[in-house]
Amino acid sequence: MFYDEAKIFVKAGNGGNGAVSFHREKYIPRGGPDGGDGGRGGNVYLRVDPSLNTLLPFSYQRQFRAEDGQPGQGNNKNGRDGADLYIDVPPGTVVYDEATGAVLGDLLEPGEVLLVARGGFGGRGNQHFATPSRQAPRFAEKGEPGEERWLRLELKLLADVGLVGLPNAGKSTLLAAVSAARPKIADYPFTTLEPMLGVVSVPGREGGTFVLADLPGLIAGASRGAGLGHEFLRHVERTRLLIHVLDGSGGLEGRDPLEDFHTINAELAAYSASLAGKPQIVAVNKMDLPEAQANWPRIARALDELGYTAYPISAATGQGVGELIRATWERLQQLPRPERVAPPLRSHRVYTLDRSQERWEAIRLSPHHFALRGPKIERLTLMTDFSNPEAAERYQRLLARWGISRRLLALGIQPGDIVHVAGRELVWEPELAEAEQTRPRRRLTKRERLLKRAGLLEEPEEEIGEQ
């Protein structure tokens, strides 16, 4: 069975915890803190594997987790970083965030990679928190949790030309006649149940080839879910050109080929405006039958008035097929390459200072419940070991230094109220916050006063984790 959609869960590795350790060596009393940092958690990437052409492997495995970073150790030993996880996908895979619907990437080229979950930073060891007034810190940072999310993968086959038409119009027979593909062919509708690709060699054109996609036949109402073809119309979106195959004989039902032509185009337009605007070449098939030969003059005249070029062919006997393929190749040379669903992925990173990461927001949810939001405060919360009194004291000291405590007090927070942040519930204890606000500050030096007057001096802050 052909799988062109999948949902998977990806979880990046957690950062390793920082170590609490003190240097112990003969003849070196009071060696000081030497706890190492935790390792970074492994990232999760999607990678294009040209040997794949379906999302079938994701029907067996849906959850993927990268390796966690290792914890730090004493003697300033840092933990090992977690190994990155690479998940192979076929070319033409579009990646969506399942929660938001946002397009994360469009993977086309072999070897192309897309970062879909970032590993957590490792926590810093206690060596980083030593100060003149706190020479023996007995706390360290916890590792940051890795990102996790559900992804929706959608495969859009990479073909230059797509075959569209009603069921039993002869699309599969045409594909088999011009390529090495061997689709199932039978004299009943919906013989083709899944897309099939074939590489077409152009007669008389040295090295001239293009990829042709055969899709299940469309019927009236396909854009609303009728029939089978609507499930695979996404594969036509990447094509540059459509070959619209008509049954020139009208089939056993005696249909009007021109009505069939308008029916299919109406379904393409209802599904997507981009499909309706794709250039088309019309192939009037089954010209080996007397009914098709009788209908041909009327069909050719009507299509010419509509601005379409029609080619009489018989996929079964090969009549006119070579001329159709050469015309298709020449038309392709005039058409641009299709655009990506998402911008191309960069081979390098550009780092810029993002002040939005430092912003925070305090909200009163109810008389005794408050919430804090913002990347920096949430990250601090996740990396703080609240079971350690010194770590909890540092957390509250930073809240006061950043002005968060002052804002919560202005909102009317009282001792014992609950503060919700990063999925945790913290009980408000204002003693440390008030002490921090009233703690005397050292006098600025002359140089610092000049810098402050010029707006170039910022208040010192403790950094959270590795940058």
Curated annotation (Swiss-Prot):
Binding site for Mg(2+): S172, T192
E.C. number(s) listed in UniProt: 3.6.5.-
Needed cofactors: Mg(2+)
Keyword Magnesium assigned: yes
Keyword Magnesium on entry: yes
Residue intervals of the OBG-type G domain: 159-333
GO cellular component, one term: cytoplasm
Domain OCT intervals: 352-430
Gene Ontology terms, MF aspect: GTP binding; GTPase activity; magnesium ion binding
Top EC class, one word: hydrolase
A Gene Ontology BP annotation from the UniProt entry: ribosome biogenesis
UniProt cross-references to InterPro entries, sorted A to Z: G_OBG (IPR031167), GTP-bd (IPR006073), GTP-bd_Obg/CgtA (IPR014100), GTP-bd_prot_GTP1/OBG_C_sf (IPR036346), GTP1_OBG_dom (IPR006169), GTP1_OBG_dom_sf (IPR036726), OBG_GTPase (IPR045086), OCT_dom (IPR015349)
Domain Obg: 1-158
Record keywords, A-Z: Cytoplasm, GTP-binding, Hydrolase, Magnesium, Metal-binding, Nucleotide-binding
Domain of life: Bacteria
Residue positions binding GTP: 165-172, 190-194, 214-217, 285-288, 314-316
Ranges in coiled-coil conformation: none
Annotated family: Belongs to the TRAFAC class OBG-HflX-like GTPase superfamily. OBG GTPase family.
Function summary: An essential GTPase which binds GTP, GDP and possibly (p)ppGpp with moderate affinity, with high nucleotide exchange rates and a fairly low GTP hydrolysis rate. Plays a role in control of the cell cycle, stress response, ribosome biogenesis and in those bacteria that undergo differentiation, in morphogenesis control.
NCBIfam families to which the protein is assigned, alphabetical: Obg_CgtA, Obg_CgtA_exten, PRK12296.1, PRK12297.1, PRK12299.1
HAMAP family for this protein: GTPase_Obg
Subunit and interaction comment: Monomer.
PANTHER family (alphabetical): DEVELOPMENTALLY REGULATED GTP-BINDING PROTEIN-RELATED, MITOCHONDRIAL RIBOSOME-ASSOCIATED GTPASE 2
Protein known as: GTPase Obg
Lineage start: Bacteria, Pseudomonadati, Thermomicrobiota, Thermomicrobia, Thermomicrobiales
Name of the coding gene: obg
